Amino acid sequence: MLVIVAGLNVFPIKSAGAVPVAEAELTTDGLRHDREYMLVRPDGRHLSQREVPELALLRPDYDGVKLVVHTPLAASPLVCEAVDGPPLDVTVHRRPCQGMDQGDEAAEWFSEVLRVPCRLVRFVGTRPTALGGGTLTYADGYPVSVLSEESLDDLNRRMDARLPMARFRPNIVLRGLGPYGEDSVTRLRGDHVDIELIRPCGRCVIINTDQDTARRSPEPLRALARYRTERFGGTREIMFGRLGVPRALGALRVGGELTAS
C-alpha cells in the first residue's frame, strides 16, 4: 500500500519542542539530530515533560553546529555552539549512557528557565534499542516513531475534540493508512529508505500536556485507555502509533510516498 509522508518532526532536545521539517535524513539513530541533546539533573537522570511540563515551551533550532533555543519563559534565547565537553554518566529511564557536557552558560540558562537544576549534554557513544537490534541517541527505546493522521482523526471524533498531532510527538506522520492502519504495518520502504516497525508506541502522561502552553489535563490518555490498552512484553500499556528501527538510510520528504507492508 502506498502512503504519504504528511509530516516530519525532529526533536533536537529530548522532551523539548519539535522542529517540523520538509525533509530529513534518516540515519541509523533515526532522523538526523533527533534527541541529540538532553537535559539532566545533577545525578544524571534525564528531565522529561512527565515531571517538568514546561520543557514543551522550549523551541530549539539546531544545524549540527549551533543550538538556538527560544522560549516564552526567557527574555533572550540561548545561543551556544556544540562542544566536546567532559563526558558525564547519565541515564534514560535508568538505562546508563553518556553525554558531553555543554558548559556552564547553557546549564545556568536552562536551570533558571525551568527552575530545576540541570545541565545540557550532547550524545556520545552508542545505545542499543530495546528490541530489533538497532541504535539510538536519547530517545526512550527506539529511534523512529510513526503515527497516522487517520488514527488521530478517529481519536478526535471519539472525544469530540481537535487535538493537534503535536500532542503525540511523532517523527513521521503518515496519511493513507486508515484509522490504526499502522498497527498492522511492519515495514515502510521508499527510495533508499527502509524502516522496520518493531512494536506499538506505549503512551504516558506527556500526551496530556498542551505543547503550546504546558498545561496538563486528563485527556487524551484517559480516552485512549478505554480502547487502546494492550499487553506487550508482559505489561499492559496504552498504545497509539508505532516505533521502528531504520534498516536502509536515505532522505524522507513531506509529500513523498512510502510503501507500507
Please name every model-derived segment.
Residues M1-S261:
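Metal-cofactor-dependent catalytic cores
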